[in-house]
A protein has these predicted regions:
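N-terminal export and membrane-targeting signals
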Residues: 1-12
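Glycan-processing catalytic domains of CAZymes
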Residues: 45-65, 71-356
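N-terminal cationic leader/targeting segments used for protein routing and processing
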Residues: 3-4, 28-31, 67, 73, ...
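C-terminal region of N-terminal signal peptides and the immediate post-cleavage residues
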Residues: 19-49, 53
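Core hydrophobic alpha-helical transmembrane segments of single-pass membrane proteins
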Residues: 10-21
Length: 356
């Protein structure tokens, strides 16, 4: 009887040792193991490849004389599901051209899983110290080369903070406007803007960032800021002459519709009428959607071409009710296009919401 008791005690001691080892492994993994995702921690605190405690308990209760069931093989790791990519990006009115500030902006965009067109608006064209650049929204002058460096910072931050294996990508557009450009030549300003965009594209390729970031340019072209259309046309013409395949987005307005300030030909010119241009129209209310639908109908009927939309632009934040939200803006523009008989016009889902 004593001998049998010793045998049972030994078996029980060995089983408890196995349980203790598993628990020790769990505590070790929590304290010093590699960092894991929040999703993993919700699933189990036991290391993925450790024996499951349930298997050990089963072994303790196995009938005498029968071998303990073999441990279950470790489950094959499943491929991580693709993260949901946001169809609406955040664009920014920039107050600085410090690359470390824009790197944080890029990292935040990656953490939001943004995917699409991002416009960094650096303000109106300007000229100072024999160089072209812009007046930032802080009122300071930023030369073109510093704007390029800032955009490289944004790109690095975005790529660095993307989850491993992410397929997200953005088109990063160097934004300006036609608001009273303080430059000797609007045409030269357009040429320099294109060359800076080309340079950003080369840097992205050289640094291995081009898989996730594409270089582009953008212009907030608004009729009220240039009623004669002269400087706006010269800027776009200069850009077209020097660009190497990069897109120039028009993220402006039509200010009352066709004929109120600009003619149909002028509005069409900057919204897809010339090479390398696309429209990313401001749709802050339903009236703006109607104006862009009118242009699309005229372009289709008169020029036998469709406006090349790249989505919509909205503005504001949670603390500012500044018009339509992105999904509502897209829906209202789509309805306006359909009502005008040009519902076939391609209107990509999503767009961008600008803050600053």
């Amino acid at each position: 009887m004593k001998k049998d008791a010793l045998i049972v005690a030994a078996a029980l001691s060995a089983a408890l040792g196995l349980v203790g080892g598993a628990l020790a492994g769990r505590n070790l993994a929590k304290g010093h193991g590699p960092a894991r995702s929040h999703a993993d921690s919700r699933t189990s605190l036991v290391p993925r490849f450790a024996p499951h405690l349930g298997d050990l308990v089963t072994a303790l209760h196995a009938p005498p004389g029968k071998p303990a069931p073999p441990p279950k093989p470790a489950a094959k790791s499943q491929p991580r599901p693709a993260l949901h990519l946001r169809g609406t990006t955040m664009s920014i009115y920039e107050h600085t051209a410090h690359p470390w500030v824009l790197a944080e902006q890029g990292c935040s965009a990656a953490q939001r899983h943004e995917n699409g067109v991002v416009v960094l608006d650096f303000g109106k064209p300007a000229h100072k110290h024999h160089g072209y650049g812009t007046i930032l929204f802080s009122g300071r002058f930023a030369p073109n080369h510093k704007i390029t460096t800032a955009m490289v910072g944004y790109s690095r931050g975005y790529v660095r903070c993307l989850p491993k294996g992410s397929t997200a990508s953005i088109t990063l557009a160097r934004g300006t406007s036609n608001y009273h450009p303080s430059v000797p030549s609007a045409y030269t300003a357009g040429v320099r803007w294109a060359r800076a965009t080309n340079k950003l594209g080369r840097i992205l390729a050289q640094e291995g960032l081009a898989e996730h970031v594409e270089a582009a340019a953008a212009d907030d072209a608004e009729p009220a800021w240039d009623p004669s259309f002269h400087k706006t046309k010269q800027f776009f013409h200069g850009f077209r002459a020097a660009v190497h395949g990069h897109t120039l987005y028009d993220y402006g307005s039509l200010d009352g519709g066709i004929g109120a300030v600009w003619s149909a030909k002028q509005a069409w010119y900057v919204a897809g009428g010339i090479r390398h241009t696309k429209a990313l129209p401001e749709i802050y209310n339903s009236a703006m959607a109607q104006e862009w639908a009118e242009l699309a109908a005229i372009a289709h009927g008169r020029y036998h071409r469709d406006v090349r939309f790249a989505g919509v632009m909205t503005q504001g934040s949670a603390s500012c009710r500044c018009g339509l939200r992105p999904h509502a803006a897209h829906r209202i523009l789509a309805h306006a296009l359909h009502a005008r008989g040009v519902g076939h016009t391609v209107l990509p889902r999503g767009g961008t919401n600008i803050i600053g």
